[in-house]
């Protein structure tokens, strides 16, 4: 599946650039210096952030988004889902992360058993000061919000809602490996089974819609695997 340079793709690049600004804070929030007022007799000082850390490459993040989409929709219990899982794990390991998986059989709103895998990738695992960065990696199996009703029961490619968030984290891992910040550790978590919420065309289970989303992150929160 080839992703064309469309408006959606430009939006993904813009999103990745915005995440880079956010990550600037991760690498500066613990680094402070002092600036002194030039007026004689004024001893007040203010803390300033010293810019450190790697630069973010949105083109790399876009390539990682495309690579995930090339597997096809990563819907639960599918071959594309399983292949993408192995690809994500391999990329984080390639960029120096300590990787573990959190597997669980989660029950969907209609009783379907979802073979869920949360992927946890850690940089600098011995660091006490840590930052948690999360995104989900599964695709929604139904495009139930598509303006074209003929697509409502077709799976979503999930480029900008799924793949792009994971791509940003992989790019951050790559940059951190190249220019590490020894006093800070990052815990990247790729949540699974997030997008299996009750579709709008389903009338039988609408009373369960609130509890049918974000199954992987709920499981993670209740069964924290991180020490």
Regions found by a protein language model. Give the residues of each.
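Extracytoplasmic/secreted proteins, especially bacterial periplasmic and envelope-associated proteins
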Residues: 60-67, 79, 83, 87-94, ...
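A non-catalytic alpha/beta surface segment that caps or lines the substrate-entry region
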Residues: 66, 73-126
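C-terminal motif of bacterial Sec signal peptides marking the signal peptidase cleavage site
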Residues: 27-30
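Bacterial N-terminal signal peptides that target proteins for export
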Residues: 8-19
């Amino acid at each position: 599946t080839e992703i064309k340079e469309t408006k959606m793709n430009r939006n993904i690049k813009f999103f990745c650039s915005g995440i880079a600004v956010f990550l600037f804070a991760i690498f500066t929030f613990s680094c402070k210096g002092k600036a002194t007022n030039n007026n004689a007799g004024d001893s007040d000082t203010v803390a300033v952030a010293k810019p450190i850390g790697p630069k973010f490459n949105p083109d790399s993040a876009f390539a990682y988004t495309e690579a995930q989409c090339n597997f096809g929709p990563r819907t639960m219990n599918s071959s594309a889902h399983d292949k993408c899982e192995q690809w994500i794990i391999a990329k984080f390991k390639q960029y120096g992360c300590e990787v573990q998986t959190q597997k669980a059989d989660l029950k969907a709103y209609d009783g379907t058993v979802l073979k869920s895998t949360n992927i946890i990738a850690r940089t600098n695992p011995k660091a006490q000061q840590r930052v948690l960065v999360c995104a989900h990696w599964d695709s929604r199996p139904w495009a139930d919000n598509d303006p074209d009703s003929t697509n409502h029961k077709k799976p979503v490619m999930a480029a900008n809602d799924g793949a792009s968030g994971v791509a940003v984290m992989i790019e951050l891992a790559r940059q951190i490996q190249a220019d590490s910040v020894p006093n800070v550790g990052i815990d990247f978590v790729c949540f699974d089974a997030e997008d299996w919420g009750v579709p709008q065309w389903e009338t039988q289970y609408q009373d369960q819609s609130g509890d049918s989303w974000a199954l992987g992150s709920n499981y993670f929160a209740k069964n924290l695997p991180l020490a």
